[in-house]
């Protein structure tokens, strides 16, 4: 590869990283237009919200659902690699950000908020703060970057650990979240409802 080709490749990569950042910014703008609150109504920001079915859940920088978004990054990395393995890494990252941002917008729409409230244990869920939603996308991107730099087996082990740990601790994880959102199971809901208040 010549110097000119390397320069052009670097320029394309930077443009795609710019696209990823632009998608995150667009997510924030659309959430604001949807009427989402910028930060928790409590008026302050926590690094981590330890509660599950509490008013602070999904309102701060991170919470017990953050591992699920990191796993999103693992999954999106593999998916993007399958679809665009010969494309720039930064383009694949932009693709992942697009999917995550689209989900975040859907998740904070009335139809999905109502679905969470009726089909899952999240009876008091009113949607994410803009800060929390944006950080979900950031954590997905971190998971994507991590998956790009470590062996597949390590990514799989960490994903399984996250699922088992959060499943044990809060009786919820990415797998259970998808199941309860798509095809609610009463036995699982009863088990989750029996979780002691955290």
UniProtKB/Swiss-Prot annotation:
UniProt keywords, alphabetically: Cell membrane, Membrane, Transmembrane, Transmembrane helix
Location of this chain's protein in the cell: Cell membrane
Any GO CC annotation of this UniProt entry: plasma membrane
Transmembrane domains' residue ranges: 14-34, 64-84, 150-170
UniProt superkingdom: Bacteria
Main location: membrane
Membrane disposition: Multi-pass membrane protein
The UniProt record lists the keyword Transmembrane: yes
Recorded family membership: Belongs to the UPF0314 family.
Name by which UniProt lists this protein: UPF0314 protein Atu8092
